[in-house]
Amino acid sequence: MKNKKGFTLIELVLVISIVALLLMAIGLTSGVKENARVHAAAESVKSLRTAAESYIAAGNMTYTGVSIAGLQTAGYLPANFSATGSNPWGGNYSIAVDSDPNKVDISLTGVNSTAAARLSALFANSASATSYSYNAWIVTF
């Protein structure tokens, strides 16, 4: 009998199974990374909200004039809090008075729609409103 070269069916099934497992592992790690980004952004939003509430508690009647730089100067935000290019998607953070001066808007740029939906869900019970447009997510407190 001649010595035949090639792959057996078992070898092919084994290789295909290993490739499938590797592809699944890659997919799972990307989901974990996105989850970490969403939660990191949520923590930063909470810090900005707390700083803004401290601004009001210090005797300011409305959020008029609130800014990241102002909150840092007043000591409500750490001096090393960076608003530019520092959110988990490489975009910016900003804080500003809402059209209602008793409310504040916190926005993140560079956010994808899936992450924006997850952020909105996280703040559904505590925010007055959330919106997403042109890669910018805004939450109002």
Model regions and ranges:
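N-terminal single-pass transmembrane signal-anchor helix
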Residues: M1-S30
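Glycine-centered flexibility motif
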Residues: V13-L14, G31, A36, G90
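A general structural signal for well-ordered secondary-structure junctions
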Residues: V19, L77, S128-A129
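Conserved hydrophobic/amphipathic alpha-helical signal-anchor segments
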Residues: G31-G70
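Extracellular/periplasmic head regions of type IV pilus-like filament subunits
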Residues: A57-A115, T140
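Low-complexity, S/T/G/P-rich flexible repeat/linker segments used as non-globular hinges
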Residues: N112-F141
